[in-house]
Structures are given as C-alpha cells and as structure tokens.
Amino acid sequence: MEADFEYFKPHILPITQMLLQRGFVRNECVNVNAPVGKIVGTRWCRQCAGHWEKEFLTHTDADGGTFYTMTGQYVNEEPDAKDTDMWALAHGYISIQSVSIDLTRDGTV
C-alpha cells in the first residue's frame, strides 16, 4: 500500500511558514505527522510514551547484504493522555513535536 498525502498538501506551506517564523533552537528538529482522514486542526504536543512489538523484519538485498524494515505494532503506554502525538492523530489533528536531535547520554563523553 502506498501512502497518499494529497489531502495534507494544503497544510504543508502554512506549517512550514509558521515553523520558519518561529525559528529553531540549537539541536532542535520538528516532527510533523498527519492523521488518517479529515484534518480538524493542528496541535503542538509531546511524543507519546510507547514501544514497538515485533518491530523488524530481516531481508537480504540483491548483493547479499542484510537490511531491516520496521513493521509490527506500536503500543501506546498512555492512551488517556491528551497532550500526546498519538492522541492528536487519533482525533484528527496534525501533530507537531519539537525534538532534540542530540541523543548523547550525559556523562558518557
């Protein structure tokens, strides 16, 4: 199945303009996700706590190399939290999260 984001197109430019006007802090990136179906709005939210079960399939490419694809099922560990990306998406909102890209564990370097 191939994803169809045609319905999301009208939202891309306004979100991009808002993010550029807002600016970014050091080591920040922004994660934007679109809900399936009708979009009712946009929400800034935090990432939901959860985990993937049965998450990777192993494949072999034409050259004999190994690669993995993500699959499985996401388990939401806080389904009643209304300030998360998963809640926003489940309720028709575009979810936006500010994410830190420096994943270095403090005290290890």
What residue ranges belong to the model's regions?
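Electrostatically charged, flexible surface regions
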Residues: A3-V109
